[in-house]
Amino acid sequence: MLTRGIYLLDTDTCIALLKKKPSVIRHLRDVGVHNCKISDVTIAELYFGAVKSGSEKHFNEVNRISSLFESYSILYLLKYAEIRWELEKKGLKIGDMDMFIAATALEEDLIIVTGNTDHFSRIEGLKIENWMER
């Protein structure tokens, strides 16, 4: 069941959308594009993939995704530091980019949409949905 609110699409969800994964497209239609956002961190990760591939098609896809969704360009540095410290105290680790995305979701009260639920579930108070399961 979908939680109603504003959704922050993680990088893997954007990639699934570009690959036209039916469950992601269905959920996006259900909640509406206007209720979905992305982080500039996600855009950076997508551009990294495009640079790595050297494919003009991939650059065009990133441009299309970044123009489709409103993005958050603010990096919540203090929240990132708090998340990182809490995880380190527990002996847990996730990638820096994921912590920046999580910090945005927590500060803006957004629901993260990701297939990477193992990492994100380590962060207390984070609302998570996986649109790739259904």
What do these predicted regions represent?
Residues L2-L9, I25-I111, K127, E133-R134:
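PIN-domain endoribonuclease scaffold, especially VapC-family toxins
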Residues C14, I43-L46, F120:
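A generic structural signal for short hydrophobic patches within well-formed alpha-helices
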Residues I15-A16, L92, D118:
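Flexible, active-site-adjacent loop/turn segments at secondary-structure boundaries
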Residues L18-K21:
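Short gly/ser/thr-rich secondary-structure transition/capping motifs
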Residues A102, H119-F120:
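Positions that flank functional sites
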Residues E107, T117-H119:
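C-terminal structural segments of small proteins and small subunits
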Residues V113-G115:
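Catalytic beta-strand/loop signature of glycosyltransferases that borders the donor
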